[in-house]
């Protein structure tokens, strides 16, 4: 596989296609809009929802009152001018990430089922829940397993948003995921061989990806999603 060099691939495209895949698994179709390359720091373009028979998600965010009143819209990073052209994402990267996400979901099927039932999303709580989980997920460092968990958690939030007839939140979640990748994970990914290295390590052989303790993550998810009134630090300090 040709390596993308230091510039890397377009994180926005990776996020958009992953979310599209997770929603399609539940029978939803999401037009991710313009997935052309965007440099780290740039915000993704909003997507547009359509639905397969039997599902009635909201129309595009610009036409929905939830989107108009939501405080969650985040502008592009200041100074996010056009940077070096990013390389197109090879299909094998998307495929490997999907396979890893599905494997993660299967391993923790019960936890994700409980999480979905407890995910009390509103336009005013979604970003806080996302930020709390992601901050704790990477508190002790970054590895590929945690990056996959990051994508899968974002996918769960998107599916639950549509299930609760708040589909405009999907555009926001995609934006938050892309921004976090660009600002906090992009350097680690590039320093560790980029997405090509992820494919080489976990693609055909599917080397075990989830070889660290998930207790703190699962505890965190439970706390964040039921809106516990204690801080994570205080809780984890007594464990």
From Swiss-Prot:
A GO cellular component annotation in the UniProt record: mitochondrion
Effect of residue 34 to A: Abolishes cleavage by caspase-3
Start and end residues of each stretch annotated as Required for interaction with SEPTIN4 isoform ARTS. Required XIAP-mediated ubiquitination and apoptosis: 92-107
Motif placement: BH1: 136-155
Keyword Phosphoprotein found: yes
PTM characteristics: Phosphorylation/dephosphorylation on Ser-70 regulates anti-apoptotic activity. Growth factor-stimulated phosphorylation on Ser-70 by PKC is required for the anti-apoptosis activity and occurs during the G2/M phase of the cell cycle. In the absence of growth factors, BCL2 appears to be phosphorylated by other protein kinases such as ERKs and stress-activated kinases. Phosphorylated by MAPK8/JNK1 at Thr-69, Ser-70 and Ser-87, which stimulates starvation-induced autophagy. Dephosphorylated by protein phosphatase 2A (PP2A).
Homology family: Belongs to the Bcl-2 family.
Protein name: Apoptosis regulator Bcl-2
Species whose genome carries this gene: Homo sapiens (Human)
Lineage: Eukaryota, Metazoa, Chordata, Craniata, Vertebrata
């Amino acid at each position: 596989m040709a390596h993308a060099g230091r510039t890397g691939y377009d994180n926005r495209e990776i996020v958009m296609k992953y979310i599209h895949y997770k929603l399609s698994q539940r029978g939803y179709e999401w037009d991710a809009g313009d997935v052309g390359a965007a440099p780290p720091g740039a915000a993704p373009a909003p997507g547009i929802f359509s639905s397969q028979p039997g599902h009635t998600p909201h129309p595009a965010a610009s036409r929905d009152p939830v989107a108009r009143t939501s405080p969650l819209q985040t502008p592009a990073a200041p100074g996010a001018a056009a940077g070096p052209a990013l390389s197109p994402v090879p299909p094998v990267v998307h495929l490997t990430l999907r396979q890893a996400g599905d494997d993660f979901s299967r391993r923790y099927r019960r936890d994700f089922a409980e999480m979905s039932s407890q995910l009390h999303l509103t336009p005013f709580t979604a970003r806080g829940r996302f930020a709390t989980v992601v901050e704790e997920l990477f508190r002790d460092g970054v590895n590929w397993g945690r990056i996959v968990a990051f994508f899968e958690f974002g996918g769960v939030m998107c599916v639950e948003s549509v299930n609760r007839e708040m589909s405009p939140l999907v555009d926001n979640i995609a934006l938050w995921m892309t921004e976090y990748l660009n600002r906090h994970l992009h350097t680690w990914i590039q320093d560790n061989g980029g997405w090509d290295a992820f494919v080489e390590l976990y693609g055909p052989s599917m080397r075990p990806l989830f070889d660290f303790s998930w207790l703190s993550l699962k505890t965190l998810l439970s706390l964040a999603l039921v809106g516990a009134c204690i801080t994570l630090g205080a809780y984890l300090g007594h464990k």
